[in-house]
Design a protein with these regions (language model features):
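Active-site-proximal segments of metallohydrolase catalytic domains
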Residues: 219-295
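Solvent-exposed loop/turn segments at secondary-structure junctions
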Residues: 187-190, 228-231, 286-290, 306-308, ...
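Fold-level signature of zinc-dependent metallopeptidase catalytic domains
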Residues: 154-214, 224-234
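Bacterial Sec-dependent N-terminal signal peptides
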Residues: 1-24
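Beta-strand-enriched, solvent-exposed domains that form extended recognition/catalytic surfaces
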Residues: 28-154
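Catalytic Zn2+-binding segment of zinc metalloproteases
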Residues: 316-332
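Short pre-active-site segment immediately N-terminal to the catalytic Zn-binding motif
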Residues: 193-196, 291-315
């Protein structure tokens, strides 16, 4: 009887905690979105940001219980405070292409301003938005923009935007309790939209045939947004090809031919204004190898290269779960991307400064740290030198992984992915 009473008490406490968490959303937010468009400005040494535009949008697809992010990932952190009580009521971390640009040689001599956008649940009362940037010297976040927002302001745009054709490839239920993945068409003309929707279905099946995504398919919704481009394909400025496309993607980001991205965050957000959205993949109607993935921003890749599906999964690992690159043999545009004196925020690479916070608990007993790469260790989990674009000073969990060379995700990456799935589907 005592055990039965304890079980009842535990269940009651759990239900009470869930009710309190749910009421936090109901207390502070409405079931729609506030989109905050802002300009990031700066160079390699410093940066700031200013709000450009605010929009009310009809759908909030994110979790309603998990409002405060626990991961500590990313180069930026958005914190939302109730203005009256100063209580932290929402937070999300992310990265941006502007943040990457700041690590290039160009940023040492130029100052630029880039457009960016992030959405939060729509507040019921006045809020303070605090945008912070990570300082690589100490890996802490420092404020670069604070802005007070009155949700009743007449200056918040409420106009509907263009409605594209949206197909539910997989609808498993309430967006607040599912991860909502959105494929957006890029470089598909009106006559090519049928191909886009077929491509999106093909990519969906590829994702859920890949461990660990194959174990959690029921926690996902998948949507395809048929944005129409005037031109077919994508730009490739390095060889003189320029296309008029919906999202303005192109190869040669930072001068690197395979790095395929876009600066046009406004068009991405415009395309998803009426669709629940936790993760975005820009599906580009092209054959040439290329892609990119930016944590909690977007990933993109081409539809028809022979390595397309592997590129998709790799880049999605970046954008969805904050996974770092584990390769160290290829050319990149970044300079001094990581501070080797501090621990890295990505869950699958380490400097060993704070390895206890990484995948140490996944290692078999007696595994040497670092782990020598030999015939006995090459197929198992360990701490192998080389990763994060450097052959020395950064370590990866396995010799081969999706984040290095398109092998299956290693245990450290898989755990990080599943934690993010549970967080975004309100299961944590």
């Amino acid at each position: 009887m005592t055990r039965f009473k304890f079980m009842l008490l535990s269940a009651a406490c759990l239900l009470f905690a869930q009710a309190c968490t749910q009421s936090t959303f109901e207390k502070y937010f409405e079931d729609k979105s506030l989109r905050i468009d802002y300009m990031s400005m700066g160079d390699a040494q410093s940066q700031t940001a200013v709000v450009h535009e605010l929009r009310e949008e009809p759908v909030w697809g994110g979790p309603k219980k998990n409002l405060i992010e626990p991961f500590g990932y990313g180069e930026y952190l958005l914190e939302v405070y109730d203005h009256e009580s100063s209580e932290l009521i929402y937070s999300r971390s992310f990265c941006s292409l502007f943040g990457e640009w700041r690590t290039t040689a160009e940023a040492k001599t130029e100052t630029q301003a880039w457009y960016n956008s992030i959405s939060i649940p729509y507040p019921k009362n006045t809020i303070l938005v605090d945008l912070k940037s990570r300082n690589k010297a100490d890996m802490q976040f420092y404020s670069i923009m604070q802005h007070v927002i009155d949700p009743s302001s007449m200056f918040i745009d409420k106009a509907p935007l263009a409605e594209n054709k949206v197909v539910a490839i997989q609808d498993n239920g309430d967006p607040a309790e599912k991860v909502d993945l959105v494929f957006i068409a890029e470089g598909y003309t009106q006559d090519e939209l049928d191909k886009f929707f077929a491509d999106a279905e093909r990519f969906t099946e590829a994702l859920f045939n890949c461990p660990p995504f194959d174990t959690c398919r029921d926690q996902w919704n998948v949507w395809a947004v048929g944005t129409v481009s005037i031109d077919s394909g994508t730009s490739s400025s390095g060889v003189g090809i320029y296309k008029n496309t919906a999202l303005k993607t192109g190869y040669y980001t930072f001068g690197l031919d395979r790095y395929l991205t876009t600066k046009d965050m406004k068009s991405i957000k415009d395309a998803t204004w009426n669709v629940p959205c936790d993760a975005v993949f820009l599906l580009i109607n092209a054959e040439t190898y290329g892609g990119g993935g930016i944590y909690n921003s977007y990933a993109c890749g081409t539809a028809d290269n022979e390595r397309t599906l592997n590129v998709f999964t790799h880049e999605f690992g970046h954008s969805f779960a904050g996974l770092g690159d584990e390769y160290f043999e290829s050319t990149v545009a970044y300079e001094s991307y990581y501070n080797l004196e501090k621990e890295l925020w990505e869950p699958n690479i380490t400097t060993l400064v704070d390895f206890d916070s990484k995948w140490k608990d996944l290692l078999p007993e007696g595994t040497p740290i670092p782990t020598p790469l030999n015939d006995e260790t090459k197929d198992g989990i360990g701490v192998f030198e080389g990763g994060g674009y450097l052959s020395e000073g950064i370590y990866r969990p396995m010799d081969h992984c999706m984040m290095r060379d398109y092998a299956p995700f290693c245990p450290a990456c898989s755990r990080a992915i599943l934690k993010m799935v549970d967080f975004l589907s309100d299961k944590q």
